[in-house]
Amino acid sequence: MSRRNWINLFSTSQSVELSGDLERGYDAALLIQSLELEYYGDRQIRPELKLSVPRSVQATILRRFKTALSICRSSAAKLSDQRGQLDSQELRQLQLIESIVSRYGSRRSTSSPSISRSPDALPRSLLGVFDSIRLQLDPSTEDSVVAGFRRRRDTTLISLRVLLLLVLVPLLVSQISGTYLISPAVNQFSPELPFLSYPKPLLEEKAAKKLRLYKQELEFDAFLKGVEPLDDAELRNKLTEKATELKHDADEESLKAIKNVFADLAGLIAFAVVCLMSRDELRVLRGFVDEAVYGLSDSAKAFAIILFTDIFVGYHSPEGWSVLLDGVADHFGLPSSQSFVNLFIATFPVVLATIFKYWIFRYLNRVSPSSVATLKGMNGGG
């Protein structure tokens, strides 16, 4: 391997490690915030305070809090010297981690947090301005900025690569295995294995309708041409030939549905394998997506949220869900049940809307409250 390849590999490894540390610390900070909001009335967690929950539950809460706080401290210590390599979104995440660490102070303050502390000599905002000027005049700032650009470039390349793998690998595995492996195997063993030749009432019903339509077409053609209708023997022969053809088509559709099931299973297994083998890259992809989403303006975020909710849980969403369910049923050769479709439409969009509103309340309201305010304004204050 050449020297440049080794440098690129080392840079990519550093980028993945830095993104992983930031993501773990950010998730831990969000966990502490959620514990504060849910159990301590959005106040600081105090181990000596007795909650109105069983002791085992409170012990679990404190254990999760201590673990998350330890992760925040570790991440803050690792990332403090690499602040110049972070972009604006990652800097906001780091600031949240540092605010959690500073709120709970040193390790000794976890068990007995201080009630008061001496005020700062200068406001923190003014100290931040001085620190920003110092960083701009520091000779090593240029190297830090270049390193940050390289890390963001590596993050983008890793995210695009793993995204392509997640999309292309399952599709290619499904198509190739279905064409060259599953299809010949099903054709070979379908006459011998009963479960590959299951009853096909829906396909048989479609074939019967086509046969009746074919009989009516023969009679209609005879009337149009002004000839005598076919006698019973000729009509029976033509209907027998057509019935044989329709039966063959129904068998082919049945086998095609079975092939689709096995091909989709192969694609699902390939997707799971890619996820297991690319766990570090998936964390980088998650950070890349967060940066892209939260980098949007408040109006763009609100527009995307309204568009998503109107498509999947809006007024016209039942028609879309009906088409989707019919397509899935046809893909797997299943009968389309209108009762099941109505039940699904009556329950699933409601559950999806509830989950989405809960996400807005618990997560987006903390990360981007201005987006929530814009969303309420675009929804007419609702």
From Swiss-Prot:
The keyword Transmembrane helix applies. One of its GO terms (cellular component) is plasma membrane. It is found in: Cell inner membrane. The chain crosses the membrane at residues 162-182, 257-277, 305-325, 340-360. Keywords: Cell inner membrane, Cell membrane, Hydrogen ion transport, Ion transport, Membrane, Transmembrane, Transmembrane helix, Transport. It is a multi-pass membrane protein. It comes from the Bacteria. One of its GO terms (molecular function) is proton transmembrane transporter activity. Belongs to the CemA family. Required for H(+) efflux immediately after light irradiation to form a rapid H(+) concentration gradient across the thylakoid membranes. Together with PxcL, contributes to transient H(+) uptake following dark to light transition. This is Proton extrusion protein PxcA. It comes from Synechococcus sp. (strain CC9605). The gene is pxcA.
